[in-house]
């Protein structure tokens, strides 16, 4: 059974994305005198499609690539990951086996350096699953991955920090240029793909250009780490462990393909539930694998911990961190350490504001889940959403901690109960301060400083409105 997400149904607006095997990607078929119009084309699991009206007639094999998915406006989110073949544990294990064979021949020029990057949310999901602490989980995962032939196992801390630093500066610059224009976060690929496909040129100017931590990590691994190892970036196979399937599509965007290295910044994305599946197939619990320290190649001094939180929110802390920075930078105000967001319609839509001289000078919000996202977009279209200066937007209810590819609840356990338990684990983590010695070193030694042409090129991206299909009436909702 496929473990990829599927088409978003209207009844799923506040729940996990579920699998589907249908795709409306138009395929050119030679017409014959007996051909009928209006037939539905269904992609089958074995790689061919069938025309449903005239019976199960085997047609020419069709291949749908990730680029087809990204260029297709048929699905309203990036849930087309059901079609992904190069972003799976099977593909990963194949690469690891082939690399081991090359090593055995002694042809070291052809050996690839395998690098794993693990995000915080999957660590917490797997920690809960195997009843370990976050740090213990990180160390046992490092040992397990190394037993498979992985060379380096990293955390996302430095990329998380850089994403926050870039996003906070981007917000301040935008505010000074045009304080009326709402800025929307950009780290959630499900939200970005939905925006490109459904609202296009209207919504894209609102979205921050700062890359997600996954893609910042891709640049650091394929360029900065490659320089340190004195190998071309194309010799590195970079794998990330993420909480949602949409990260697979994000890694496959052509915006994140390096012409210099002739490779993607992130070659493969696997998810929490796929790691669990790999461990199940190994028939050993995570704690049974030898523990090993994570690598820290960015500076000589290692941080005291490898698993960090970023403010109190569970999706990177964008709203809280940027609010505090902007209050100080723009208005010389120092908000309290712990911010108090006001809940609106539900726990997934909250807001906070800063008052100065009887005027609201900053108004931020957090909008999780597609129901709240749709309400937000409609407000923007009606001109009412402009009251927000910044909105942290995440496609999944409760944010990344409840990503669609996190380990599933046990029998009898509700999703919200599991999410609350993961939230408690997150709150116990040490809190990272992004402006630290490690990020300063990367700005100095790799990016030629902050706000430079190189940092703008490598830490920011662009978006593309997807043209609507002429066959839009055939979309299955």
Swiss-Prot record:
<feature type="binding site">
    <location>
        <position position="75"/>
    </location>
    <ligand>
        <name>[4Fe-4S] cluster 1</name>
    </ligand>
</feature>
<feature type="binding site">
    <location>
        <position position="244"/>
    </location>
    <ligand>
        <name>[4Fe-4S] cluster 2</name>
    </ligand>
</feature>
<feature type="binding site">
    <location>
        <position position="396"/>
    </location>
    <ligand>
        <name>[4Fe-4S] cluster 2</name>
    </ligand>
</feature>
<dbReference type="InterPro" id="IPR050340">
    <property type="entry name" value="Cytosolic_Fe-S_CAF"/>
</dbReference>
<dbReference type="GO" id="GO:0016226">
    <property type="term" value="P:iron-sulfur cluster assembly"/>
</dbReference>
<dbReference type="InterPro" id="IPR003149">
    <property type="entry name" value="Fe_hydrogenase_ssu"/>
</dbReference>
<feature type="binding site">
    <location>
        <position position="400"/>
    </location>
    <ligand>
        <name>[4Fe-4S] cluster 2</name>
    </ligand>
</feature>
<comment type="similarity">
    <text>Belongs to the NARF family.</text>
</comment>
<keyword id="KW-0408">Iron</keyword>
<feature type="binding site">
    <location>
        <position position="69"/>
    </location>
    <ligand>
        <name>[4Fe-4S] cluster 1</name>
    </ligand>
</feature>
<dbReference type="Pfam" id="PF02906">
    <property type="entry name" value="Fe_hyd_lg_C"/>
</dbReference>
<keyword id="KW-0004">4Fe-4S</keyword>
<dbReference type="InterPro" id="IPR004108">
    <property type="entry name" value="Fe_hydrogenase_lsu_C"/>
</dbReference>
<keyword id="KW-0479">Metal-binding</keyword>
<protein>
    <recommendedName>
        <fullName>Probable cytosolic Fe-S cluster assembly factor GL21135</fullName>
    </recommendedName>
</protein>
<feature type="binding site">
    <location>
        <position position="23"/>
    </location>
    <ligand>
        <name>[4Fe-4S] cluster 1</name>
    </ligand>
</feature>
<dbReference type="GO" id="GO:0046872">
    <property type="term" value="F:metal ion binding"/>
</dbReference>
<feature type="binding site">
    <location>
        <position position="188"/>
    </location>
    <ligand>
        <name>[4Fe-4S] cluster 2</name>
    </ligand>
</feature>
<comment type="function">
    <text>Component of the cytosolic iron-sulfur (Fe/S) protein assembly machinery. Required for maturation of extramitochondrial Fe/S proteins.</text>
</comment>
<feature type="binding site">
    <location>
        <position position="72"/>
    </location>
    <ligand>
        <name>[4Fe-4S] cluster 1</name>
    </ligand>
</feature>
<dbReference type="Pfam" id="PF02256">
    <property type="entry name" value="Fe_hyd_SSU"/>
</dbReference>
<dbReference type="GO" id="GO:0051539">
    <property type="term" value="F:4 iron, 4 sulfur cluster binding"/>
</dbReference>
<dbReference type="InterPro" id="IPR009016">
    <property type="entry name" value="Fe_hydrogenase"/>
</dbReference>
<keyword id="KW-0411">Iron-sulfur</keyword>
